[in-house]
């Protein structure tokens, strides 16, 4: 029983069906979002500040102002599209990861093309990030727009979507998808790579909450490397509002603008709260996925018996 509980379903050679990973990934996404929603709202508010890094508003000030002016419910602004985003993203991410992982293992068996375990996880994770971004991006953009709204009155997801389509066209729902694709695919690939690296390092040690610990370290590592890309993604999603311009600019132009006006550290606004949010999210996501998958497989085996 214990060996089943501690099985690494993300390792190279693990056999997981698309149905199993789809269901476990959906559960994982829903739980992870419910736990970390307020931190996500605070992170987005910090990332959208345009002042120089030294004159940035602190996390404490952002939280105090938000609670004072908008009420505690504002910590969950954008939660509806975000919950949909996380469920869809979790399902797409883990299903794609297991599918690519199986394909790479099959390729190794048939052609002799054999990637090291770390590269196997990195490639599978990066592919999972690309597919997940394509599937869920409009919800990511809506989540950002709603969380960034500083008015006390809450905006609806459908109303915000209609406003974007009306003023920016249907493609407005995909504003910033290029930096998002780069940011998310890189982050996801590094997260799975880090997770497997830590699990291999720990080996068979019986450590409580082992999957969560590995996920926490993986989340912190991947976010630390790719955070500037995430900041550019958020700025691109909010460009029309932040810069009062209907014209879109490329990621490199926006990068240069941030560095010129806010300094290099401007790319790291909200980094602390982001790590505080991303690390627990990765921990919960990977922990819940592993145990949900183990439970689903046990139920399936009992049904077959």
UniProtKB/Swiss-Prot annotation:
Domain of life: Eukaryota
Family label: Belongs to the mitochondrial carrier (TC 2.A.29) family.
Membrane topology label: Multi-pass membrane protein
Solcar repeat start and end residues: 16-103, 116-201, 206-295
Major subcellular location class: mitochondrion
Location in the cell: Mitochondrion inner membrane
Alphabetical keyword list: Membrane, Mitochondrion, Mitochondrion inner membrane, Repeat, Transmembrane, Transmembrane helix, Transport
GO cellular component, one term: mitochondrial inner membrane
Single GO MF annotation: thiamine pyrophosphate transmembrane transporter activity
GO biological process: mitochondrial thiamine pyrophosphate transmembrane transport
Name this polypeptide is given: Mitochondrial thiamine pyrophosphate carrier 1
Protein encoded by which gene: TPC1
Transmembrane segments: 16-32, 84-100, 122-142, 169-193, 213-229, 270-287
InterPro entries for the chain: Mit_carrier, Mitochondrial_sb/sol_carrier, Mt_carrier_dom_sf
Role played: Mitochondrial transporter that mediates uptake of thiamine pyrophosphate (ThPP) into mitochondria.
């Amino acid at each position: 029983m214990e060996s089943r509980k501690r099985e690494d379903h993300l390792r190279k050679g693990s056999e997981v069906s698309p149905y199993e990973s789809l269901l476990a990934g959906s559960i994982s996404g829903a739980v992870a979002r419910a736990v970390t929603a307020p931190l996500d709202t605070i992170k987005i508010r910090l990332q959208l500040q345009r002042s120089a890094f030294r004159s940035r508003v602190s996390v404490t000030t952002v939280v105090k102002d938000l609670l004072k002016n908008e009420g505690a419910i504002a910590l969950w602004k954008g939660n509806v599209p975000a919950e949909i985003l996380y469920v869809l993203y979790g399902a797409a991410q883990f299903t794609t990861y297991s599918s690519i992982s199986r394909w790479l293992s099959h390729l190794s068996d048939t052609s002799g093309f054999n990637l090291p375990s770390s590269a196997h996880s990195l490639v599978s994770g990066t592919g999972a990030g690309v597919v997940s971004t394509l599937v869920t991006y409009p919800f990511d953009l809506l989540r950002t727009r709603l969380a960034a709204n500083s008015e006390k009155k809450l905006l609806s997801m459908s109303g915000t979507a209609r406003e974007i389509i009306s003023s920016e066209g249907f493609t407005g729902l995909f504003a910033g998808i290029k930096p998002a694709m780069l940011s998310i695919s890189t982050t996801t690939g590094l997260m799975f790579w880090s997770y497997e690296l830590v699990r291999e390092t720990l080996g068979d040690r019986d450590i409580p909450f082992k999957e969560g610990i590995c996920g926490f370290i993986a989340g912190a590592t991947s976010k630390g490397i790719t955070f500037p890309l995430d900041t550019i993604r958020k700025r691109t999603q909010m460009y029309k509002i932040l810069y009062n311009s209907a014209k879109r600019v490329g990621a490199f132009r926006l990068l240069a603008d941030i560095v010129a006006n806010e300094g290099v550290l401007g790319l790291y606004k909200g980094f602390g709260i982001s790590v505080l949010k991303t690390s627990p999210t990765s921990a919960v996501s990977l922990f819940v996925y592993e145990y949900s998958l183990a439970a689903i497989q046990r139920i399936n085996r009992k049904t077959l018996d």
